[in-house]
Amino acid sequence: MKPMYRSRSWRRKYVRTPGGRTVIHFERRKPKVAHCAMCGRPLNGVPRGRPSELRKLPKTKKRPERPYPNLCPSCMRKVMKAQVRASITA
């Protein structure tokens, strides 16, 4: 085993070969799930993947198709309400 693979930053995937041997394939771990910028809740509709994997996805699959895709829906509503209320009073 190469010294670089000894660290646990590489995921160990056990693969059975056609010859019947079990070998270890090393692959990078998936990053953590995306979180809301305001409250920190996990975001739905944002895939977990390394940048090289996400690069292959179309733009609509990388993030939600709504205003403020970096916020969860409830925080997005709060921000939009605050903007509207600020524009009414100004």
UniProtKB/Swiss-Prot annotation:
<feature type="binding site">
    <location>
        <position position="75"/>
    </location>
    <ligand>
        <name>Zn(2+)</name>
    </ligand>
</feature>
<keyword id="KW-0687">Ribonucleoprotein</keyword>
<comment type="subunit">
    <text>Part of the 50S ribosomal subunit.</text>
</comment>
<dbReference type="InterPro" id="IPR038562">
    <property type="entry name" value="Ribosomal_eL34_C_sf"/>
</dbReference>
<feature type="binding site">
    <location>
        <position position="36"/>
    </location>
    <ligand>
        <name>Zn(2+)</name>
    </ligand>
</feature>
<dbReference type="InterPro" id="IPR047868">
    <property type="entry name" value="Ribosomal_L34e_arc-type"/>
</dbReference>
<dbReference type="GO" id="GO:0003735">
    <property type="term" value="F:structural constituent of ribosome"/>
</dbReference>
<dbReference type="GO" id="GO:1990904">
    <property type="term" value="C:ribonucleoprotein complex"/>
</dbReference>
<keyword id="KW-0862">Zinc</keyword>
<dbReference type="Pfam" id="PF01199">
    <property type="entry name" value="Ribosomal_L34e"/>
</dbReference>
<dbReference type="GO" id="GO:0005840">
    <property type="term" value="C:ribosome"/>
</dbReference>
<dbReference type="GO" id="GO:0006412">
    <property type="term" value="P:translation"/>
</dbReference>
<dbReference type="InterPro" id="IPR018065">
    <property type="entry name" value="Ribosomal_eL34_CS"/>
</dbReference>
<dbReference type="GO" id="GO:0046872">
    <property type="term" value="F:metal ion binding"/>
</dbReference>
<protein>
    <recommendedName>
        <fullName>Large ribosomal subunit protein eL34</fullName>
    </recommendedName>
</protein>
<comment type="similarity">
    <text>Belongs to the eukaryotic ribosomal protein eL34 family.</text>
</comment>
<dbReference type="InterPro" id="IPR008195">
    <property type="entry name" value="Ribosomal_eL34"/>
</dbReference>
<feature type="binding site">
    <location>
        <position position="39"/>
    </location>
    <ligand>
        <name>Zn(2+)</name>
    </ligand>
</feature>
<feature type="region of interest" description="Disordered">
    <location>
        <begin position="41"/>
        <end position="72"/>
    </location>
</feature>
<feature type="binding site">
    <location>
        <position position="72"/>
    </location>
    <ligand>
        <name>Zn(2+)</name>
    </ligand>
</feature>
<keyword id="KW-0479">Metal-binding</keyword>
<keyword id="KW-0689">Ribosomal protein</keyword>
